[in-house]
Design a protein with these regions (language model features):
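Short beta-strand segments
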Residues: 62-63, 103-104, 230-233, 251-253, ...
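Short, flexible/disordered intra-domain loops and linkers
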Residues: 10-12, 67-79, 130, 276-284, ...
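Active-site acidic catalytic loop and adjacent metal/ATP-binding pocket
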Residues: 44-52, 60-61, 112, 212-264, ...
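Active-site activation/catalytic loop segments of kinase-like enzymes and analogous catalytic loops
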Residues: 263-298, 312-333
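ATP-binding pocket architecture of kinase catalytic cores
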Residues: 38-172
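An alpha-helical support segment within catalytic cores of ATP-dependent transferases
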Residues: 14-33, 135, 154-233, 243, ...
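A general structural signal marking secondary-structure boundaries and capping sites
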Residues: 92-95, 106, 149, 153-160, ...
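Hydrophobic/aromatic-rich alpha-helical bundle segments in the mid-to-C-terminal region
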Residues: 163-164, 323-345
Length: 374
C-alpha cells in the first residue's frame, strides 16, 4: 500500500485531500487492521472517519486538518487533538457523562490522528425525526439533557476562558466574564472587518452596542458573584447522541469547552434546541429542560434579569459571528444565511432582544423539521 504515499504525496502539505483509503493506510501502519472505513461529512476542524476493526471494534478516527496554529472560530483558543483527549478524560472523571474513551493517539508521516470509542446511539435530530417530531419525545429528551447540564455545571473553576485541562484556563487571570465577552467580540469584529461583511459605520454601531450593554452588567459578572463553570458551548441538534428513549448517550464535540458564565450554555440551548419547532413549543421546551436541570441540583436562575440580559447579548454576538462565517458561502443550502443573519443582527440591536424563532427558521433548512411538532 506504499503507493498511496508515493503517488498522492501524502504529507502535511496536502492533508486537506485525505481520503478514506489514505486514512486506512495511516491507521493500518500503526498496527490496526481495518474491516471498513467511511468518511463522516461533519466537522470543521478535523477529518473524521467511522472505522470498524477486523475484530469488529467500532471506532472513530479523527485527523488533524492542515492548518497551522488551528484556532477555535468561536472563541479563538488553540485547538488540538491533544486538548480534545484531555477534555474527554476530564469530563468523564468529573461528571461521569458519556464521552469517548481514547483508543490510541498516533503520528504517521507528520500527520496526527486519534482513534476513540464510537459511542452508542443516534443523533438527536435523527431521534426526533424517527419519532415523527413527537412533542412528548422532544420534551422528554430535553428534560434528560437538563440533568446532564446540571451535572456538568457542578465542575467549577476560578477564571474564565478556554478550558485546556483540569488546571489550565487560557488566557490566564480573567476574573470578570465581561472581559472575556469583550475579547471574543473584538476577535469576531476583526474578522467581520477583514472580510468586509459590514461597512465601517455598521461595525462601529455594533461595537458600541456590545461594549455599552456589557458595561451595564459588568459588576455582576465577577467570578465571586457567578462562579465559572464547565460549559460544552455548542450543543445543537447534530452534535450529540441519544438512546431510543431520548436520553443522551454520547457527547463527542468537546474541543471548544469553556470555563464560563453558565449563560454561555443556556443561550446556545435557546439558539439551537428550545426553538427547534415554533414559538409556542419554545416555552414548553425550556420548562422541560429546567425540570431536569433542577432535579439534578442545577442552581442557575433563568428568570434573573442579569442572566437573561447576558444570554441575549451572547445570542446577538453569535448572530454576528454567523453573519460573518456564512459570508460568501454558496452551496445551494446556505446561500442566503449570511444576509438573513445580518438582518437579524440589526433587528436584535434595535429591539435589544432576540427572536429565537427567526433563528430556527433560518437553520430549519438543514434538519428539515416542521414548524409544528407532532
Amino acid at each position: 500500500m506504499k503507493h498511496l504515499l508515493d503517488n498522492n504525496k501524502l504529507s502535511l502539505s496536502n492533508i486537506d485531500k485525505i481520503s478514506e483509503s489514505k486514512a486506512k493506510y495511516l491507521i493500518e501502519e500503526k498496527g490496526c487492521k481495518i474491516k471498513s472505513i467511511k468518511r463522516i461529512p461533519e466537522g470543521s476542524n478535523h477529518y473524521s472517519f467511522d472505522v470498524i476493526l477486523d475484530d469488529g471494534t467500532p471506532l472513530i478516527g479523527k485527523f488533524k486538518k492542515n492548518k497551522n496554529n488551528l484556532r477555535d472560530t468561536l472563541f479563538g483558543g488553540r485547538i488540538s487533538l491533544e486538548r480534545e483527549c484531555v477534555l474527554y478524560s476530564l469530563i468523564r472523571k468529573k461528571t461521569g457523562l458519556p464521552v469517548p474513551k481514547l483508543y490510541g493517539k498516533y503520528k504517521n508521516g507528520g500527520i496526527s490522528f486519534i482513534l476513540v470509542e464510537k459511542l452508542p446511539g443516534k443523533l438527536w435530530s435523527d431521534y426526533i425525526r424517527e419519532n415523527n417530531y413527537s412533542t412528548s419525545c422532544f420534551l422528554k429528551s430535553l428534560e434528560y439533557l437538563g440533568q446532564d447540564i446540571a451535572r456538568l455545571q457542578k465542575v467549577t473553576f476560578e477564571t474564565f476562558g478556554d478550558l485546556m485541562n483540569e488546571y489550565l484556563v487560557l488566557p490566564k487571570g480573567i476574573i470578570n466574564f465581561a472581559d472575556r465577552f469583550i475579547g471574543i467580540t473584538k476577535m469576531r469584529l476583526k474578522r467581520v472587518k477583514g472580510k468586509n461583511v459590514l461597512d465601517t459605520k455598521k461595525v462601529h454601531l455594533v461595537k458600541k452596542y456590545f461594549f455599552q450593554q456589557i458595561s451595564e452588567i459588568r459588576e455582576h459578572l465577577y467570578n465571586y458573584k457567578s462562579k465559572p463553570v464547565l460549559v460544552f458551548t455548542d450543543v445543537h441538534s447534530r452534535n450529540y447522541l441519544v438512546n431510543d428513549f431520548g436520553k443522551p448517550s454520547g457527547y463527542f464535540d468537546l474541543e471548544s469547552c469553556q470555563s464560563a458564565h453558565p449563560a454561555l450554555e443556556f443561550y446556545g440551548l435557546k439558539f439551537f434546541l428550545f426553538n427547534y419547532f415554533n414559538y409556542e413549543t419554545f416555552k414548553k421546551a425550556e420548562d422541560s429542560f429546567f425540570a431536569g436541570y433542577k432535579k439534578e441540583g442545577g442552581v442557575y436562575d433563568r428568570g434573573d434579569y442579569i442572566n437573561k440580559k447576558l444570554e441575549d447579548l451572547l445570542a446577538i454576538n453569535r448572530i454576528m459571528e454567523l453573519n460573518e462565517s456564512y459570508y460568501g458561502i454558496k452551496d445551494g443550502l446556505r446561500d442566503t444565511w449570511s444576509m438573513k443573519f445580518k438582518e437579524l443582527l440589526f433587528e436584535a440591536i434595535e429591539i435589544n432582544g432576540v427572536n429565537y424563532s427567526k433563528i430556527a427558521d433560518i437553520i430549519r433548512a438543514k434538519d428539515g423539521q416542521p414548524k409544528n411538532p407532532g
